[in-house]
Structure formats: C-alpha cells, structure tokens
C-alpha cells in the first residue's frame, strides 16, 4: 500500500490494540494526556465501509519515551509540544527507523501544545532550575 495509517497509544493503556485484536478493553493509568482514555472514540473508524482495516498498526509508547521526546522537541527544535505530541513523534521516529521504511515519508501530528503541561512531569526539570 502507498499509504498506511498507524495509531499511537500509551503502552500502559493499549485500548486500540485491544480493540483491533478483539480483546476486552483493559485500560490502565498513564501520563500521556489525551490518549488511552479507556475507550476507542466513535470517530476513530478502525475499518472502512468495505470492512478493510484503516488503522494497519498501533505503536505503543511508554510514559518515559513520550515525556523524553516532548522535552527533546523543546530543547533541540524549539517546539513546545505536549506529552501526546512527544508520543506521536517518538512513534514516528521508531517507524522511520525500520529498514522497510528507508526513503519513505513519515508524517505525524503535533496535537497539543506544552503550555498547558508546565505544571506536570513534562516541565519538572525546568521548574527545578528556576526554583534554585
């Protein structure tokens, strides 16, 4: 296929993966706000009208990897993204590293700004520096 849609979800609350596998939903606590809410939103159509899968894969991202990437985006790229943006970029980089994806265009979405997360784990290091 020339286009693949890959979902991203918290490793600790993989409800999309569970739904795709026909398993009961077992959501769990995680720190990636805005994702893995314990249900699959009604507007996320996992299959098209013909019954073919639209989401071909789901990449699970840990809390630590999502936070680390969001911090890295701020520090190295000047992009103040939220934790879910960190998760999406982390997943996109992992997908891009695969040999079969060499030379392919990988696109992701920065779906949140980090401004609303300045009081969370995302900005712990920055707050500690300012406090000292």
Can you say where each PLM-predicted feature lies in the sequence?
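Phosphate-binding loop/pocket of nucleotide- and phosphate-handling active sites
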Residues: 29, 44-48, 90-132
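Active-site/ligand-binding loops adjacent to catalytic centers
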Residues: 2-83, 121-132
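Substrate-binding/catalytic subdomain of NAD(P)-dependent oxidoreductase enzymes
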Residues: 80-92
């Amino acid at each position: 296929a020339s286009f693949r849609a890959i979902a991203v979800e918290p490793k600790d609350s993989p409800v999309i993966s569970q739904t795709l596998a026909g398993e009961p939903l077992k959501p769990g606590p995680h720190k990636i706000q805005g994702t893995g809410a314990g249900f699959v939103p009604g507007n996320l159509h996992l299959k098209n009208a013909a019954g073919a899968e639209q989401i071909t894969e789901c990449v699970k991202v840990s809390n630590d990897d999502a936070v680390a990437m969001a911090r890295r985006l701020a520090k190295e790229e000047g992009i103040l993204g939220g934790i879910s943006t960190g998760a999406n970029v982390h997943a996109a980089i992992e997908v891009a590293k695969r040999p079969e994806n060499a030379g392919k265009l990988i696109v992701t979405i920065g779906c949140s700004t980090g401004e609303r997360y300045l009081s969370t784990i995302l900005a712990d290091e920055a707050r500690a520096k300012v406090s000292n």
